[in-house]
């Protein structure tokens, strides 16, 4: 069973939840990468052995529903900058990825949830990853791959500025433990301010 939850993310259930245990995956959505999003979504669904709910993090929906209010500006070359810290960023979901725990909480998701960038291609059942973190990291708030990587070029996709910083790529795929007290306490204010 696969449910695509393209939703407005209002403070109500995104969709009627299946009675069986469901894996919840939030995928970052960027309007310039719609095809990549659809490939990622399809590859997740194709290999899933358990019910799977995929939720797109569409910044327009998140803004219109009041969940994402953080402002950004764009220069003449199309480079986006965060208004709060004036740092450049490249995708529409650079900040909204951190809304996943808030959106999960208001939609009564109580187990592990996953976020991934839209350019992922899944070749195996994602349920194995969910089971792995449930069995081996139940005491952790977040699970991710701790890459030790620094960029070698100054630009990346769509000629956006490439920055090097600690923990680069760590947030490309994250699993949040909705049972952990620190994750439960996250709110949209933590992302927007």
Predicted regions and their residues:
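Glycosyltransferase catalytic domains, chiefly GT-A lineage
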Residues: 2-193
């Amino acid at each position: 069973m696969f449910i695509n939850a393209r939703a407005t993310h209002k403070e109500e259930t995104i969709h009627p939840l299946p009675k069986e245990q469901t894996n919840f995956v939030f995928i970052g959505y960027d309007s310039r990468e719609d095809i990549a999003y659809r490939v990622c979504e399809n590859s997740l669904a194709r290999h899933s052995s358990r019910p799977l709910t995929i939720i797109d993090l569409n910044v327009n929906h998140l803004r219109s529903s009041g969940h994402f209010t953080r402002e950004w500006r764009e220069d003449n070359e199309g480079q986006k900058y965060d208004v709060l810290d004036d740092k450049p960023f490249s995708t529409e979901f650079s900040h909204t990825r951190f809304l996943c725990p808030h959106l999960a909480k208001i939609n009564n998701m109580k187990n592990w949830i996953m976020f991934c960038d839209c350019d992922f291609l899944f070749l195996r059942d994602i349920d194995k990853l969910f089971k792995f973190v449930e069995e081996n990291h139940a005491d952790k708030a977040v699970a991710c791959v701790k890459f030790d990587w620094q960029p070698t070029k100054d630009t990346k996709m769509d000629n956006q500025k490439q920055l090097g910083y600690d923990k680069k790529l760590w947030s490309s795929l994250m699993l949040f433990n909705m049972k952990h007290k620190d994750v439960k306490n996250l709110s949209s204010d933590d992302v927007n301010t």
